[in-house]
């Protein structure tokens, strides 16, 4: 595994060095969020004004509420690569550990593959949460939407997200969301979810506790989340933004 990791790191830096040579030569650049625009401008030493934003699209026909599926009470859901540090899953697991003594029925459903003998597996075992945390991988988008339909709430514990598809997909499914303020997540969630600081398992536990105890708040956030995605982040909206950008670029070129 060590040599594979080194190879991946080498490839990443080769790609990054290539990008740093190419980017300054481009007249028009597009990224998916204000947070990404700021980071790219800083890392590549270019003006933010050179970067346009077209948000990622979410398929709201697949990721949608499914009333026919009954929600499981006290079922928290997360999408996170188990051993990817930036996804912050370890903080959520520690939050679940805190709440386990208060809520006997509490369980965590994770969309992600658990690596045997990985850090996450060891943490789950160390905290005695093997029967509370269930990992799923290799699912279709429809199967993911069906899992969301069973969830009481969704949590995005990421330390950084360039956009935040997990939050957007959960919101599109009508699931109330708790997310960190990492990267672009506040742009996606807005006021349609509960936002907490990154790397703070105590804040995550407090937010989960609050949401599980308040059905009115869950219903309010679920409705606001679905509406926000339809208004700002559907594929129809993303396509329209991209078409408009193409028109602006063509107009600028013609005017030269």
PLM segments and residue spans:
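Aromatic "clamp/platform" in nucleotide-sugar-dependent glycosyltransferases that forms part
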Residues: 159
């Amino acid at each position: 595994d060590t040599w594979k990791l080194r190879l991946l790191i080498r490839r990443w830096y080769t790609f990054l060095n290539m990008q740093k040579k190419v980017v300054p030569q481009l007249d028009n650049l597009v990224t998916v969020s204000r947070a990404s625009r700021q980071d790219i401008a800083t890392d590549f030493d270019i003006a933010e004004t050179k970067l346009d934003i077209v948000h990622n699209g979410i398929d709201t026909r697949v990721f949608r509420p499914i009333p026919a599926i009954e929600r499981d009470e006290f079922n928290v859901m997360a999408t996170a690569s188990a051993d990817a540090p930036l996804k912050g899953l370890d903080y959520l697991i520690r939050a679940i550990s805190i709440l386990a003594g208060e809520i006997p029925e509490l369980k965590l459903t994770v969309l992600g593959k658990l690596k045997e003998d990985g850090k996450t597996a060891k943490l789950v075992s160390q905290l005695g949460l093997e029967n509370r945390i269930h990992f799923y991988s290799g699912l279709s988008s429809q199967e993911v939407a069906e899992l969301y339909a069973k969830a009481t709430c969704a949590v995005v514990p990421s330390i950084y997200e360039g956009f935040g598809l997990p939050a957007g997909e959960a919101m599109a499914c009508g699931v109330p969301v708790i997310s960190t303020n990492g990267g672009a997540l506040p742009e996606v969630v807005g006021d349609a979810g509960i936002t907490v600081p990154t790397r703070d398992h105590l804040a995550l536990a407090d937010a989960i506790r609050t949401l599980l105890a308040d059905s009115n708040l869950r219903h309010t956030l679920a409705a606001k989340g679905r509406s926000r995605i339809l208004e700002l982040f559907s594929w129809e909206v993303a396509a329209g933004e991209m078409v408009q950008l193409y028109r602006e670029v063509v107009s600028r070129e013609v005017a030269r």
